[in-house]
Amino acid sequence: LNDDLRLALRLADSADAITMEHFRSATLAVRAKADATPVSEADEAVERIIRETLARERPDDGVVGEELGADARGSRRWIIDPIDATSNYIRAIPVFATLIALEHEVGVVSAPALGRRWWASRGDGAFCNGNRIRVSPIASLDDAHLLYDSVKDFDPFGTSERFLALARRTKRTRAFGDFWSHMLVAEGAAEIAIEPSVALWDLAALQVIVEEAGGRFTDLHGDARADGGSAISSNGLLHDAALEAFR
């Protein structure tokens, strides 16, 4: 493991301790942000401890976080989502994770309530709980599993019918959503995951892991980026077919 990945894994350990301490707590404090999405005291505590550690150990690096904003230090940026799927977390649904990325180079997704952690560093492959992972070899939509969050997420973009047309061509669909959809693609359990509206901190860690697992990761325009506002991850073999459905 390189030093940056080792650090990211330690950051994930700290995050897991906080999220599991507050998980299923009857006294968890939750409020609505300006965009009406929820944030809990655990989200803020996780991001604070990660930022404090990075300030000590990588003082020249910048940090972008969902809850506490961005700073412009350095050419390297750490991208943090303290709790991806906060809505699950506050309802005691165990599908949530802390996402930590050194932009383009390192990705860690830690889902302690699921007992799973995925990680990758550029050029070194992708892993889940220490086992190497690889995308599936399925090359036909007829045999593919397609994952997403919610059909209504496509409504503001006028693409719901296009998504449904693609879904009907696949073998099976599941609305797992958030990080888990993309990690299941990286593991080879599914072939395509699609999200029409997501932020950089939702995607930066996922992109590294999916690509290091042999998959392909783009926005809905086909650009290989985590800051395009949307995402398709795939096993690579079915990526063009998924993109074509939205054109």
Region spans (language model):
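N-terminal subdomain of lithium-sensitive/metallo-dependent phosphomonoesterases centered on the IMPase/IPPase/PAP
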Residues: 1-83, 238-244
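Small-residue (primarily alanine) positions within well-ordered alpha-helices
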Residues: 8, 12-15, 107, 206, ...
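Residue-level signal for inorganic ion chemistry
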Residues: 19-22, 43, 54, 86, ...
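Solvent-exposed alpha-helices and their adjacent loops that cap or buttress functional pockets
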Residues: 31, 70-72, 91, 119, ...
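Generic detector of well-ordered alpha-helical packing
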Residues: 44, 48, 67, 82-85, ...
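DPxDG-like acidic metal-binding loop motif
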Residues: 73-127
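An extended, acidic
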Residues: 134-247
